[in-house]
Amino acid sequence: MAVTKLVLVRHGESQWNNENRFTGWYDVDLSEKGVGEAKAAGKLLKEEGYSFDFAYTSVLKRAIHTLWNVLDELDQAWLPVEKSWKLNERHYGALQGLNKAETAEKYGDEQVKQWRRGFAVTPPELTKDDERYPGHDPRYAQLTEKELPLTESLALTIDRVIPYWNETILPRMKSGERIIIAAHGNSLRALVKYLDNMSEEEILELNIPTGVPLVYEFDENFKPIKHYYLGNADEIAAKAAAVANQGKAK
């Protein structure tokens, strides 16, 4: 049976992951640790014999720079890359820039968990005169006002990620190209929910660690057979638990 592999990588730790802030579409860069995570992911993929024909990422530099570091370690810096806002992190609305633990102290752990992980729950909206509104950013100049989010739930994130997967990424895989996607916690959770047909309750508990390659294997009909992380299982579990704990009051 012919097996097709897809590699997903959540960006390495960002400066705002390190400061425990809601980031969303804010274009913060990788921390020093995050650069190291991205390089380590590339080294691991090289050791395991991976190489790629095409890459996808978002229009946010923490994902772009993660991909650059991964491809650099693979000696594939030349690889063609498509950047799309449809792979951006979920938009966190008026929470963007706020400290997660301080927000939990103010509103309670459960409310923040729902904002972070509730399937159809949207954080408080931005207003269009807010400097954080994406309509002020030239990289989104081609988007319609309807496409520009004031806030997003995971459900709304799925509404942009999955059509992009089906219409753009999957056809490349079906043509035989080996694909890597460097994206974000919630855009990847959106894709994982779809691929694994997870329930809303199951996706609530899923935490994707930063900078760890996640491999999906597909059968000849492009149905997922299995998935697994590359690397030390205990370290990966600890990183996933740390992601889950970010939204709790200290």
UniProtKB/Swiss-Prot annotation:
<comment type="function">
    <text>Catalyzes the interconversion of 2-phosphoglycerate and 3-phosphoglycerate.</text>
</comment>
<keyword id="KW-0413">Isomerase</keyword>
<feature type="binding site">
    <location>
        <position position="100"/>
    </location>
    <ligand>
        <name>substrate</name>
    </ligand>
</feature>
<dbReference type="GO" id="GO:0006094">
    <property type="term" value="P:gluconeogenesis"/>
</dbReference>
<dbReference type="GO" id="GO:0006096">
    <property type="term" value="P:glycolytic process"/>
</dbReference>
<feature type="active site" description="Tele-phosphohistidine intermediate">
    <location>
        <position position="11"/>
    </location>
</feature>
<dbReference type="InterPro" id="IPR001345">
    <property type="entry name" value="PG/BPGM_mutase_AS"/>
</dbReference>
<feature type="binding site">
    <location>
        <begin position="185"/>
        <end position="186"/>
    </location>
    <ligand>
        <name>substrate</name>
    </ligand>
</feature>
<protein>
    <recommendedName>
        <fullName>2,3-bisphosphoglycerate-dependent phosphoglycerate mutase</fullName>
        <ecNumber>5.4.2.11</ecNumber>
    </recommendedName>
</protein>
<dbReference type="InterPro" id="IPR029033">
    <property type="entry name" value="His_PPase_superfam"/>
</dbReference>
<comment type="pathway">
    <text>Carbohydrate degradation; glycolysis; pyruvate from D-glyceraldehyde 3-phosphate: step 3/5.</text>
</comment>
<dbReference type="Pfam" id="PF00300">
    <property type="entry name" value="His_Phos_1"/>
</dbReference>
<dbReference type="InterPro" id="IPR013078">
    <property type="entry name" value="His_Pase_superF_clade-1"/>
</dbReference>
<comment type="subunit">
    <text>Homodimer.</text>
</comment>
<feature type="binding site">
    <location>
        <begin position="23"/>
        <end position="24"/>
    </location>
    <ligand>
        <name>substrate</name>
    </ligand>
</feature>
<feature type="binding site">
    <location>
        <position position="62"/>
    </location>
    <ligand>
        <name>substrate</name>
    </ligand>
</feature>
<dbReference type="InterPro" id="IPR005952">
    <property type="entry name" value="Phosphogly_mut1"/>
</dbReference>
<keyword id="KW-0324">Glycolysis</keyword>
<comment type="similarity">
    <text>Belongs to the phosphoglycerate mutase family. BPG-dependent PGAM subfamily.</text>
</comment>
<keyword id="KW-0312">Gluconeogenesis</keyword>
<feature type="site" description="Transition state stabilizer">
    <location>
        <position position="184"/>
    </location>
</feature>
<feature type="binding site">
    <location>
        <begin position="10"/>
        <end position="17"/>
    </location>
    <ligand>
        <name>substrate</name>
    </ligand>
</feature>
<dbReference type="GO" id="GO:0004619">
    <property type="term" value="F:phosphoglycerate mutase activity"/>
</dbReference>
<feature type="binding site">
    <location>
        <begin position="89"/>
        <end position="92"/>
    </location>
    <ligand>
        <name>substrate</name>
    </ligand>
</feature>
<feature type="active site" description="Proton donor/acceptor">
    <location>
        <position position="89"/>
    </location>
</feature>
<feature type="binding site">
    <location>
        <begin position="116"/>
        <end position="117"/>
    </location>
    <ligand>
        <name>substrate</name>
    </ligand>
</feature>
